[in-house]
Amino acid sequence: YDQHAYQVKQNYKVTYEDAQVVSILLTTYHYHAGSAHGMYNTKGLVYNKITGQRIPLYNYVKIANPQQIERGINSGILRFYSEGHKKADLLPNWNVEYVSDNYYLKGKGAIGLVYQPYELGPYSYGNTFVEFSPKAIEYFNRMNG
């Protein structure tokens, strides 16, 4: 055991694809022997299929600071989900500490920001996701032009 991973799994999901863009969620799970539970990390990858280049979040939405995300969640402009796409609440004493550049395309013009376990909620929430609808994207882009 000696601090080595006991088990590692990886999977992916294509969340959106068209002629120019592909969006993938890549999840890696690891369990270290003796740990109370395993841990996982989910990464959103959005690529231009023509150039092969990653597409940064700011090409889609401009977010000035983490407080904008937190206010958006609390006001209902943005949707907040736990693992399994279950609607969740941002619990008291949990704050958005940074603007994640880890994102994926959901289709129909929506974008999801990805946060890892414990970043925006307890472990039972798993990964958490902040969804920007097309209207929310337009609102943020007007605000942060």
Language-model-derived ranges and their functions:
Residues 1-145:
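Compositionally biased intrinsically disordered regions enriched in Thr/Gly
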